[in-house]
Swiss-Prot record:
EC id: 1.3.1.98
Domain annotation FAD-binding PCMH-type: ranges: 36-203
Protein name, entry field: UDP-N-acetylenolpyruvoylglucosamine reductase
HAMAP family given in the database record: MurB
The encoding gene: murB
Enzyme class at the top of the EC tree: oxidoreductase
Length: 324
């Protein structure tokens, strides 16, 4: 049963949409755009042509209409009831660029894949970005959550973030204003990141290539990179590795419906073929329960769960612990 009505929402926006150049899609299937390949419909999906188009759309969008921003579809799990309101999916054409921006500096659009920034840095002898080669997803998401790999975090290279607020006003946030900590920033969720400025340091291209090769080889060896997965499921608790806790709790390879904790890397959930959003989220909460009961540690989700449940298919967070 469909839980959203995109045509009705589109009609409510009035004649202002006639001037919008980007793509507006009512009742857009989210299982086509997320890496899990699961979940319900976006009531209305908007893909702006460029930043001016984004600002124009925001100015006609009523404040009471929910707005959800996604990147390339990694690191998110969409519930089967879909996402009410507008899902903003920035276009590669307008927000997927990566370019040099001064000595050892790189400017990347928020939808630019992390690995493209790593490649740009290598091609120009700029060190400090090899870790991006092993992170699935896009730069906007990396900046939002302080993504990291191989002992390096996004905040170590980030200079500033360009953003737009819900009313279409533009902002620039410094590294300090992002309020970074492990896999987290305090930047307002109302801000839509449009581009990010980074700075590295001079390094020989051969050395950078060797570092990137090591990252790629490690990732392909220990992670299910060819499966339908959103990336790391849970954050590492202080002093612990999430995968090790999951393994010790006996959850490696655990299956619920069409979802499984990967046997290769058990902090990765995978869609084995026909998993629903319910299967995936229920599996995650079951793992949290098992780890707490056996290890006494509460895992915190790294995957973002979006949207609403189908009636009768709700997933209750373990022990009343917040699922955020």
């Amino acid at each position: 049963m469909k839980q959203v009505n995109g045509e009705k929402l589109l009609a409510s926006l009035g004649d202002g949409v006639k001037d919008i150049r980007g793509r507006i899609t009512p009742d857009a299937p989210m299982d086509r755009v997320t890496w899990f390949r699961a979940g319900g419909l976006a009531e209305l999906m908007f893909q702006p042509h460029d930043i001016d188009d984004l600002v124009a759309f925001l100015k006609i969008l009523p404040e009471e209409v929910p707005l959800t921003v996604i990147g390339v579809g990694s690191n998110i799990l969409v519930r089967d009831g879909g996402i009410p309101g507008v899902v903003l999916r920035l276009s590669a054409k307008g927000f997927g660029f990566v370019e040099l921006a001064g000595e050892n500096r790189i400017l990347a659009g928020s939808i630019c894949p992390d690995k493209h920034v790593a490649a740009m840095a290598m091609d120009n002898g700029i060190g400090g970005f090899h870790f991006f080669y092993g992170i699935p997803g896009s730069i906007g998401g990396a900046a939002r959550m302080n993504a990291g790999a191989n002992g390096v975090e996004t905040r170590e290279r980030l200079i500033e973030v360009n953003a737009v607020d819900r009313k279409g006003n533009k902002h620039v946030l410094s590294n300090a204003e992002m309020g970074y900590s492990y896999r987290h920033s305090t930047a307002s969720s109302e801000l839509i990141f449009t581009s990010v400025l980074f700075e590295g340091y001079p390094e020989e291209r051969a050395q950078i290539r060797a570092e990137m090769d090591a990252v790629r080889n490690h990732r392909e060896t220990v992670q299910p990179v060819r499966e339908k997965t959103g990336g790391s499921t849970f954050k590492n608790p202080a002093g612990h590795s999430a995968w090790k806790l999951i393994d010790e709790a006996g959850c490696r390879g655990l299956v619920i419906g069409g979802a499984q904790m990967s046997s290769l890397h058990c902090n990765f959930m995978i869609n084995m073929g026909q998993a629903t959003g319910y299967d995936l989220e229920y599996l995650g909460e079951q793992v949290r329960r098992e780890v707490f009961e056996k290890e006494g540690i509460k895992l915190e989700w790294e995957i973002k769960r979006l949207g609403v449940f189908m009636p009768g298919r709700e997933v209750r967070p373990f022990h009343g612990v917040t699922s955020e």
